[in-house]
């Protein structure tokens, strides 16, 4: 793919997330800068089972920050990529995602509020915690990482102790 085509696709994506509505309303695509995903989308109807997934949002933000580093040319479009990626990252409210707990929740639903599950064990939430702890605007407290790390599961095999991270999202 030519660089110019990649820049266009990236800008379309970043502009969409930056300009789309944030909030608990049915047409929102995010809340506190965490993206809303859907298990079922039906044309001309409200999405079914919409929820903000904290780790999926972390993947999106990590990708945005990555392309912001890669696309470093001094052009208006590539400057906009860097600006939008930084703005999206700064908008994410990691403290809100804790819902007053020690660790980060899995997400939030417009109809019912925060999901009851929290990130536990060594899993993909490592990226979520790195982004949250490093946030220049709404950082997670250092204690949240210690709380998450305290849920790691350690195993022994052939006399060696290791950090377990099995299939199924760290189960």
Residue ranges and their predicted role:
Residues 1-171:
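Ser/Thr/Asn(+Pro)-rich, low-complexity disordered segments
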